[in-house]
């Protein structure tokens, strides 16, 4: 999901 990608962008 996109949420996982956002977490990685932190």
UniProtKB/Swiss-Prot annotation:
Alphabetized UniProt keyword annotations: Antimicrobial, Fungicide
The protein's role, per its UniProt record: The synthetic peptide has antifungal activity against B.cinerea (MIC=20 uM), F.oxysporum (MIC=20 uM), A.niger (MIC=41 uM), C.albicans strain 01U (MIC=13 uM), C.albicans strain 38U (MIC=7 uM), C.parapsilosis (MIC=105 uM), C.neoformans strain L26 (MIC=209 uM), C.neoformans strain L30 (MIC=209 uM) and T.rubrum (MIC=3 uM). Has no antibacterial or cytotoxic activity.
Keyword Ribosomal protein belongs to the record: no
Top-level division of the source organism's lineage: Eukaryota
Annotated organism of origin: Cenchritis muricatus (Beaded periwinkle)
Protein name (database record): Antifungal peptide
GO biological process annotation, one example: killing of cells of another organism
């Amino acid at each position: 999901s996109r949420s996982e990608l956002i977490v990685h962008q932190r």
